[in-house]
Amino acid sequence: MKWNDSGFDQGAFEMKQLRIEMKGDINDWLSYRYRQRLNRGNDGSGNIDNVPTSIDWAGVGIRLNKFSFFAGKQCVSYGGIEFDLNPIDIYEYSDMIEHMSNFMTGLNVAYNYNSYQQIQFQVLNSLNGPSEEMYGDLERTKLPLVYTLNWNGNFLDVFKTRWSASVMNETKGEKMYYYALGNEFNFSPKWHAYFDWMYSREGVDRKGIITNIVGTDNQAHNAFNAEYMSYVLHVNYRFAPKWNLFAKGMYETASVYKASDEVEKGKYRTAWGYAGGIEFYPMESNLHFFLAYVGRSYKYTDRAKALGEDNFSTIVCQWDSFGRCLYSSSCFPFLFVMKNRQATCCLPAIYHEMSFFYQN
């Protein structure tokens, strides 16, 4: 149920996520994975890889001793703990992740130094659809690819890392550089936390946040020289075997790092996000009920206000349940810390939400 400044807006049941997934091992060296969103369109005829965006995963994996390979549609191996979590476990994403294109087609190569240290190198398409849909009338690059180097570390199950560095060909002569440092902490069986830092420097604004602020009425392309930075801290306290308290904070900035097209250099927006709530797990991992309070606050600088922007805040209260298959869903194709691998057919992950929404 949603309210806005005018009062009651809408009351309806809604499935945020509805996916079907199959993955498993054919033998000790060959595996497969397929996942599709059932509540997204299935037309991939105009896409660069000829695959609809409803398909997140469609590929084959090969394991050869310490090396692993995965070819096909897959998730970009960006760093960050939250980026790798199952989407149905996230009540509110940061703007950085919310505006990303996460599933593209290509090749991933992983080297497992041991059971606790892994390096990945990945080359994927940087686009799903045509370049014009993402960037406008700018001349397209002939190699629309994104290259990512990723380190996944595990230190005594107390401190874990998901760090990455990426470079992406956007349009001719323009690139995006993206860095993510994900840090997970298991202080005790009851206390768990993660802290993510993300930075994106984009020759052409791929996220679209700066473009929406500065406007492109006299341009047929996205803004140039956008810069985004995000900090995310999430803490869990499992105060009882079936009960969990959580709190989350986010701080993000959107800036222009070099003036161009009459767009002034400097910061345009600061965003704060916060969430807190309680979760109840009647079973070990298959289902949980929740009550969550989520707030966002957006503050614009004077240069953004001169372009017509104004500060605003949103509040959403959510309550209901998550259901998913027992086999957890990870963004990374190589779950190298798992000892037992077996063929699994996952039931659809369903997220149905009742909300109270307020915007000021």
Question: Where in this protein do the model-derived segments appear?
Answer:
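Residues that flank catalytic or metal-binding motifs in active/ligand-binding sites
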Residues: 16, 54-56, 103-105, 145-147, ...
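Solenoidal tandem-repeat scaffolds enriched in leucines and small polar residues
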Residues: 128-130, 136-140, 151-154, 158-161
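Outer-membrane beta-barrel pore domains
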Residues: 4-8, 47-48, 157-340, 354
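N-terminal amphipathic/hydrophobic targeting modules at extreme N-termini
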Residues: 44, 340-351
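Outer membrane beta-barrel
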Residues: 1-2, 7-129, 152-155
